[in-house]
Regions:
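Short loop/turn motifs at secondary-structure boundaries
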Residues: 1-100
């Protein structure tokens, strides 16, 4: 996953394919030091996406761009099957963010 914060319409936010099929989700993003820099519920719903800005601590300005680097994410989402069973799925991965 590759992102930029240059607002050119390409790679401007984290795309998680088909996440709209699982609205019961939460996403956390951490920097290389393990500090959470982003947290949200309902990722991908109504424009709720990660655009490379701080959004987890009240001590940091939410309008401040994150520095270039690799970030790690944890995505949890609830999956309901046809029989009515519910399963919570956990996915982890990384994002490379370029801040120009």
């Amino acid at each position: 996953n590759y992102m930029t914060t240059n607002d050119n319409g390409k790679n401007d936010y984290l795309i998680i394919e088909n996440i709209e099929r699982f609205p019961e989700n939460n996403l956390e993003i951490y920097n290389r030091y393990g500090v959470r820099v982003y947290k949200t519920d309902g990722y991908g719903i109504n424009g709720n996406v990660f655009t490379g800005y701080f959004q987890a601590k009240v001590t940091v300005d939410k309008n401040e761009k994150l520095p270039t680097g690799t970030y790690y994410y944890i995505l949890n989402y609830t999956k309901h099957d046809k029989s009515g069973q519910t399963q919570v799925i956990k996915k982890v991965g990384y994002i490379h963010l370029e801040n120009h």
